[in-house]
């Protein structure tokens, strides 16, 4: 099962500051668009990655997630922005209403909060997620909004295509938010050992190149 989107947030204050996007998640690494999947009850994962995100910000992130009961996944993420020398903490819950299958789309809702120091910036977001199987791959759709303190909410929308490439799983995605240039992103992920995933992505926003590389361990 893919990792939860606090990369998402586009789970991340790193992303929020540039486009008010979620990645919060963490989406299923290395995607920024979230998927409707969650970990099985009693299972979890730890995702870690380095990225150059919107605005040229560079950051390290560690993001654990766990499903205490069927259909509910809770997660946290700590990001250190080495460009701004700031630290962001994010917490989110993801409730799956229907599980994705080959015959039916899956749906989930995500609620999250974030705090950045030393700027003392607070943010919150909401994301509706749908995943549908469309042979030979999967389509993921996101629609939500994010808000920082004393500012109006900003809507965002995202779409991603994910497909098995044989040697790895690959994706291409598009994310847009109010008052920000859209992001186009693509990348692979591959299991290099039992329960251990290596992943990466490269993308563009407003003429800038974005990239990330990370690992995800299931437990």
For the regions a protein language model found, what residue spans apply to each?
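Transmembrane beta-barrel domains of Gram-negative outer membranes and organellar outer membranes
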Residues: 26-219
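Cleavable N-terminal export/targeting peptides
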Residues: 1-32
């Amino acid at each position: 099962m893919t990792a939860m989107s606090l990369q998402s947030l586009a789970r991340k204050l790193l992303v929020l500051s540039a486009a008010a996007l979620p990645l919060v998640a963490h989406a299923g690494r290395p995607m920024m668009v979230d998927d409707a999947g969650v970990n099985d009850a009693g299972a979890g994962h730890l995702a870690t990655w380095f990225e150059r995100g919107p605005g040229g910000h560079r950051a390290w992130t560690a993001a654990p997630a766990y499903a205490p009961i069927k259909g509910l996944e809770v997660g946290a993420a700590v990001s250190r922005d080495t460009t701004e020398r700031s630290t962001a903490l994010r917490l989110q819950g993801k409730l799956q209403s229907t599980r994705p299958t080959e015959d039916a789309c899956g749906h989930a809702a995500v609620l999250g909060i974030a705090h950045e120091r030393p700027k003392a910036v607070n943010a919150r977001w909401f994301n509706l997620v749908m995943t549908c199987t469309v042979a030979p791959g999967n389509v993921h759709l996101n629609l939500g909004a994010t808000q920082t303190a004393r500012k109006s909410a900003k809507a965002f929308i995202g779409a991603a295509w994910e497909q098995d490439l044989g040697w790895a799983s690959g994706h291409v995605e598009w994310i847009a938010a109010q008052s920000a240039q859209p992001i186009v992103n693509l990348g692979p992920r591959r299991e290099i050992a039992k329960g251990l995933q290596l992943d990466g992505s490269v993308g563009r926003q407003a003429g800038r190149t974005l990239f990330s590389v990370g690992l995800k361990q299931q437990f």
